[in-house]
Amino acid sequence: MNPAMTWEKFWSIIDRVRAQADMQDEASVNQFLYTELIKLPQDELLGFDCAWQSYRNKANFPKMVAAACIINDGSSDDRFTDFRNWLIMQGYDAYRQALIDPDNLAALNIPFRNTEWMGCGNVAWYAYAGQQLRTYFEKAGITAELHRKYPALLELPDDLNRAIMREQLAPHHAQETEWERQMLRTEVKHYIDTSGLAYSYNEFYTQNMPDKVAWKTLQSDLFSNLPQIKAERMPQDFSVVLPKLWRKRQAWDTERTKRPPYRGEER
């Protein structure tokens, strides 16, 4: 199976998510991204994941690392990967401008110290598993059984799908205050865990991982309107190479010291 995705379709998916989600909240972004991706046929879902990897890799260069350090008080390999997930979710124009010069990130509404979005880089995995789980629940009679036991909680056709999504994306969120809702969550999680499908994307990707020709074909389209990244060394003085972003971060720090801290906020 070859990945089926174009740069226009990839960024149109991102735009639809941005139009619906709270873009300051990764959990909201993950849910709306999942809802979009679970609709895709498997070749396009594979293509979306490959495109995500490609765009994330293209944004891996020293000056972008410096931008991540300014925004998040430092960085590491994993943290920089998560930062680039956030960058992709800012949309095509912001992404392209950041490739031209990461200092252009200063024009965005940046949630400083909160742009390391690990989860959204994995949503394609969850969406694929979600497709398999929906089929499994239906064929195994689980869907009918849960609707019989929890009719008030599963009134709408998509209520169970949302319950499955919540357990995939946030399996450790706080317990429900209503006993019946907590029981539904417990049962859904049990069926997911015992299905053997929670990590089914790993096998799917291994079996359908694109070869070099397919990667090259995909990336020639994905990168067709993007700038070339110049080879450079890690900058020594971030305030000099990224002056706008540096000033914006300094202003944010100053504002935080003037107001009372939020409950639990680090200073």
Predicted segments with their positions:
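N-terminal leader/targeting peptides and immediately adjacent processing regions
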Residues: 1-42
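Core of folded catalytic or high-affinity ligand/protein-binding domains
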Residues: 31, 35-116, 166-168, 172, ...
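Non-Sec secretion/translocation targeting segments of pathogen effectors
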Residues: 256-267
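Basic, alpha-helical nucleic-acid-binding regions used in initiation and control of genome expression
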Residues: 92-97, 101-242, 246
